[in-house]
């Protein structure tokens, strides 16, 4: 984060690269960079210093466009929770049925009608500071807010979709996985792909554990694969910026 200058007013990506070329690679270097240290800029740098000291990911996310939030994945890598949800139906009236959370390489899930509520989501997220999704802004986060209305105030959100798009990678999660050579169980993919809602309905109708097991196994791969995807996208973005630099 400390090499990021686009969080300050009046500094865009091109100006940021100029600063890097001139040896300005930390906020502390700004006074010697030749840039005008206006009262506003001094105030913003002080705010950023305080936010960094407090590891305030929400502050930094608020200062970055969604496609630039890959920068958070360096200093906050160990404070990320990777989240994916399965729905109980289709359309705007559907609700989360399974919420999968992967933290510290450990997967867990919450089920509608059993333990899926605000308090349990917060407990599972623990001391996480960042929630990482794929297409989360339009899907996961929007539906999670029905259960956890202030989730966007408590955690920063990193949506990998706009980051992938900026790299020229288009499509859904499975397509991005293939592009990045991230593998998942072929049996699970063939068994579940496009049938998650059907599996949920079969589970609630019959109570047969096999349906739930397959659904949560599918969700675990969706959820846990977000970590290697995020790291690859992060490093690709950094390499692209360094080449420009």
Model-identified regions with their sequence ranges:
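Catalytic micro-motifs at enzyme active sites that drive phosphoryl/nucleotidyl and oxygen chemistry
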Residues: 68-72, 86-90, 119-121
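Two-metal-ion RNase H-like nuclease active-site motif
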Residues: 78-88, 219
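Short catalytic/ligand-binding loop motif for oxyanion handling, primarily in non-cytosolic enzymes
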Residues: 90-91, 140-143, 227
């Amino acid at each position: 984060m400390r090499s990021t200058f686009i969080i300050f007013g009046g500094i865009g990506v091109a100006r940021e690269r100029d600063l890097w070329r001139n040896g300005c690679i930390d906020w502390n270097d700004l006074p010697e960079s030749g840039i005008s240290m206006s009262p506003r800029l001094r105030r913003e740098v002080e705010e950023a210093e305080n936010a960094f000291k407090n590891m305030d990911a929400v502050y930094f996310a608020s200062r970055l466009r969604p496609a630039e939030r890959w920068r958070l994945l360096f200093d906050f890598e160990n404070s990320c929770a990777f989240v994916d949800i399965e729905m109980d139906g289709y359309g705007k009236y559907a609700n989360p049925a399974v919420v999968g959370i992967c933290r510290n390489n450990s997967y867990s899930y919450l089920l509608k009608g059993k333990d899926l509520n605000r308090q349990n989501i917060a407990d599972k997220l623990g001391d996480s500071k960042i929630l990482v999704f794929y297409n989360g802004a339009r899907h996961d986060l929007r539906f999670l807010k029905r259960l956890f209305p202030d989730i966007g105030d408590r955690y920063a959100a990193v949506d990998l979709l706009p980051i992938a798009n900026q790299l020229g990678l288009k499509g859904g999660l499975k397509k991005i996985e293939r592009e990045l050579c991230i593998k998942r169980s072929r049996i699970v993919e063939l068994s579940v792909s496009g049938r998650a809602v059907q599996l949920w309905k079969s589970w609630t109708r019959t109570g047969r554990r096999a349906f739930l097991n397959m659904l949560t196994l599918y969700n675990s791969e969706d959820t846990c694969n977000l970590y290697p995807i995020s790291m690859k996208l992060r490093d690709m973005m950094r390499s692209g910026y360094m080449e420009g630099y």
